[in-house]
């Protein structure tokens, strides 16, 4: 689960080192400010390049379809890198060995949309 460019090297490393990546969750494509062009997230782009299935739900909260999909996936582990959504508590028990959250800064002190920039200021 991830969205920005920061998450791309982690997904590439997992893929290149032979780990089985069943699915990638990322934010849905967003309209850019100029021209209102629809832009995919960097993670969606690399998932397409590597031919890894991906999903782009607008929310996981009260989302039975995604809950059931993840449940049926029967994954061993989930890695979250700057996903940009709160993962509902009920999802946490769906993955056998749990979730690993990779964050660009110390949590909870430097959380939010710009943790690296805030830690520098």
Describe these PLM feature segments.
Residues 1-121:
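One-carbon transfer enzymes
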């Amino acid at each position: 689960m991830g969205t920005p460019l920061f998450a791309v090297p982690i997904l590439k490393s997992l893929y290149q080192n032979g780990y089985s990546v069943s699915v990638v969750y990322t934010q849905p494509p967003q309209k850019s400010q100029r021209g209102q062009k629809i832009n995919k997230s960097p993670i969606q782009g690399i998932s397409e390049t590597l031919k890894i299935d991906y999903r782009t739900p607008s929310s996981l909260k009260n989302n039975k379809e995604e809950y059931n999909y993840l449940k049926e996936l029967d994954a061993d582990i989930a890695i979250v890198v700057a996903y940009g959504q709160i993962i509902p508590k009920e999802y946490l028990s769906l993955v056998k060995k749990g979730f690993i959250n990779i964050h660009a800064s110390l949590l909870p002190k430097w959380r939010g949309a710009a943790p690296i920039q805030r830690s520098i200021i």
